[in-house]
Amino acid sequence: MVAAASTYMIDGKQYVSIAVGWGGVFGLSQRVTELQSPGTVYTFAIDGKAQPPAFVKYQTEELLQGVKYDPKDVPEGTAIYVAACATCHGVPGVDKGGNVRNLGYVSAETIANLKDFVFKGPFRDQGMPDFTGKLRDEDVVKIQAFIQGTADAIRPKN
């Protein structure tokens, strides 16, 4: 539950509504189950018989690999990522992400083209900030280095 339940009556029938899912700040970058649970309001009728919908499993990519970067960019990329990205995207590859994808589990193509998402990108209508005027192209290159460098650092060695 992400909020208190509410109960009410309509035409003599009692209902209970509950907001559920991994919403709020925690749910942006974290999850505690392999099931996808977008923010939903469930309403139950007392003595109702309907079944809830089935949850689906999260679809994740493998741990990121293949993005070229200069290891010297990782330290500054870390600071920029923590300031601009970590609140929503979490630590790359350390967890599987929440309602917002963990960038350690996206395609190499996505990270290689990161500035297309950071500057006037396609997810602005879903809450992704536009970092135009706040970050520079060089900052994005350093963020890419941090993301791929972190994925490389945590990748299990065979």
Feature names for model-found ranges:
Residues D73-E76, Y81-T87, P92, S107-T110, ...:
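Short pre-active-site segment immediately N-terminal to redox-active cysteine/selenocysteine motifs
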Residues K57-I80:
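Electrostatic cytochrome c docking/interface patches
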Residues A5, G90-K120:
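Gly/Gly-Pro-rich "capping" loops immediately C-terminal to redox-active cysteine motifs
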Residues E34-D47:
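Beta-propeller blade signature
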